């Protein structure tokens, strides 16, 4: 409990009477909410986690180690959490500003428990000390959605590498009711894609033949 802060809107305060909370204004959107989280956390190291995410650990056999569980993956244990935090700190100590996780439905890279410079979504660890050097240069509200793609590209194009856990992975159901789906539209998706393409034309392209 002491290590978890729920980021909630004012209209939700009554639902979290005994929790540590960071309260933001109602209906400000995911991009502005993320900006507030980053700037409030400052130079700490911290995890940002969507509220519908589950974490799993994959069987060590994927990485040429003896099996450490039944099946291909399982939910994290307390010992897994301790090991995961050690690995995240190791990556941050080695200048990886942000660390993410592989989506559980995608097979891992064999014999590679960590890979580098990919997309980071849904759950990630941030080194606030490194982020503090560029945080004021980033327009976190450039797009109202796809803000995670924008954040990834802002950091990568500035030369800040990331690390992505293969052995530890996340599960998330997409298009659940609530959240961004209360205001996301196809028109908004298209507008954000065009803005990202304009800002990062070398790395974000649009295939108009499929539209």
Region spans (language model):
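A short acidic (Asp/Glu
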Residues: 15-17, 57-60, 109-114, 153-154, ...
């Amino acid at each position: 409990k002491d290590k978890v802060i729920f980021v909630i809107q004012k209209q939700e305060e009554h639902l979290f009477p005994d929790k540590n909370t960071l309260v933001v204004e109602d209906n400000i959107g995911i991009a502005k909410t993320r900006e507030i989280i980053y700037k409030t956390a400052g130079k700490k190291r911290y995890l940002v986690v969507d509220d519908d995410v589950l974490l799993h650990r994959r069987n060590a056999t994927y990485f040429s180690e003896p099996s450490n569980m039944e099946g291909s993956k399982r939910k994290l244990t307390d010992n897994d959490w301790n090991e995961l935090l050690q690995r995240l700190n190791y990556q941050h100590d080695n200048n990886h500003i942000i660390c993410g996780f592989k989506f559980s439905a995608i097979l891992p890279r064999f014999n590679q428990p960590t890979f580098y410079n990919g997309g980071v979504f849904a759950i990630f660890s941030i080194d606030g000390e490194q982020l503090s050097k560029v945080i004021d240069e980033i327009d976190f509200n450039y797009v109202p959605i796809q803000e995670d793609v924008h954040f990834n590209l802002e950091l990568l194009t500035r030369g800040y590498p990331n690390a992505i856990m293969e052995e530890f992975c996340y599960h998330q159901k997409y298009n659940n009711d609530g959240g961004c789906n209360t205001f996301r539209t196809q028109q908004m998706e298209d507008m954000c894609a065009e803005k990202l393409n304009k800002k990062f034309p070398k790395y974000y392209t649009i295939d108009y033949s499929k539209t």
